[in-house]
Amino acid sequence: MDVYQTEEQQVEAIKGFWKENGTAVIAGLVLGFAGFIGFNVYKDTQLENEVLTSDAYQTVMESAGVDGKAFSASASKFIAENKDSSYASLTALALAKEAATHKDWPQVAIHLASAIESSSNQGIKAIASVRLARVQIQLEQYTEALATLSVTLPESFKSAIEETKGDAYFKQGKVELARNAYQAALDVEGQTNNGALQMKLNDLAQLSSIAK
């Protein structure tokens, strides 16, 4: 036997359902539609913010290499206002480059450390880390340089990382560790014809023979 024996009973059942639950259903539909609109508004707002940030970044970069002081001021302001943006780390790298033109190595190190901290991109982190380690070697901060390179970084940067480690070890007078690092850098695929690296290894060999 059917639950509903006639069309009239079905109609009355529908009426009863809407009488009891209609408000909740309509509210749910309204909220769902509002949520859909809200999500799209959020996406549109997010996109708009990204475009504005991109435009601001381009404006800051236009002054790079033209007016150092103005660029440093506007770039620092941009980073402070956009700490969570991927552009913050790129701006920090640009500030490091600007400071390097004046051989202000301590300031270069500060900007590179900022780029490492603010970036979620492993490639940018690796670039900034290798550059920071080289600057730390320039500042005779050899232990700090090795610590900078001790974190996990993309395998594609292994050659540059090992070579920089070798430079730090060499400056510390740790010839064997330097040789191992240079060899590890040279052993990376595609680096077998790296003349500069091979020269460093040859120089170490000569130093070792003289020491004997």
Residue positions per predicted region:
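Short extracytoplasmic
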Residues: 58-90
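Amphipathic alpha-helical repeat elements characteristic of tetratricopeptide repeat
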Residues: 8, 47-54, 69-72, 90, ...
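Flexible helix-coil transition and linker loops at the boundaries of alpha-helical arrays
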Residues: 41-45, 79-82, 117-119
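Soluble extracytoplasmic domains of inner/organellar membrane proteins
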Residues: 88, 92, 100-212
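N-terminal positive-inside, membrane-proximal cytosolic segments immediately preceding the first
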Residues: 1-31
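Transmembrane signal-anchor/signal-peptide helices with a preference for the extracytoplasmic
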Residues: 34-55
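Membrane-interface junctions
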Residues: 17-24, 81-84, 118, 155
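Helix-turn-helix repeat elements of alpha-solenoid scaffolds
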Residues: 27-35, 63-74, 101-109, 135-143
